[in-house]
Amino acid sequence: MMKPTQADCDIKVRYFMPLHETDMCMHATVGSVTALVRRGICQTSPITLETNLGSMRVDWEMRDEQIDVAVEQFLPQYQPTAPTVSEICQALRIAPEALTGGPIQSVSTSRFKLLIPLISKAVLDHLVPDFELLWSLCDRYETTGFYPFVLGTDHVLYARQFPKRAGYDEDPATGVAASALAAYLVKYRQVTVQNGWNCFTIFQGEAMGQPSVIYADVFVEENKIARTRIRGNAKML
């Protein structure tokens, strides 16, 4: 975090993984804003962050000693091509029957993630990918990771995130992927959609013993996606 170069921004943020810089990271944003508020550096809401992808609004609210952070994302984009079912099954080491038959697509509200609907949480929890093949497919289809997921009830989902050559094989919390997933669910009407905010709860990291919960929201206006955001909170260690 540093001084902004844009006059309309409060703080400039850059994000780094072990192997490279990345343009956007939601859990780092939630954690950073939490730290700024706790230390008294950030005293008003909202604030505007300068990122590699442009300016980004962040709202925060103190609630029962917990800081709730809401990070605006961008309008969704959709990749026109995706790996074949055969390629996905080879990379995830699953049978085709483990897929629901729903759309498989790379979606982005800041960074592209390949969204893959699976039939059960048991299948999700037991995934042991072929990472070299997975990374190769990410390169070929211009996406930054695989995000297999299972749709539960009441807008609850379970997911895992396997990033492309990040320096680690799996991520316990991926807000950019959760935001893309929420937009995907609304676009393809995989859930009941209403005008106004459509709110989703995504559980991630359980299979790796680092559980997290991410709140992803999509605002629909005149049956079109008008806004996306991620909500969450962090603990200071």
Q: Language-model features: where?
A:
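Active-site proximal loop and beta-alpha junction motif in alpha/beta enzyme cores
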Residues: 1-24, 30-237
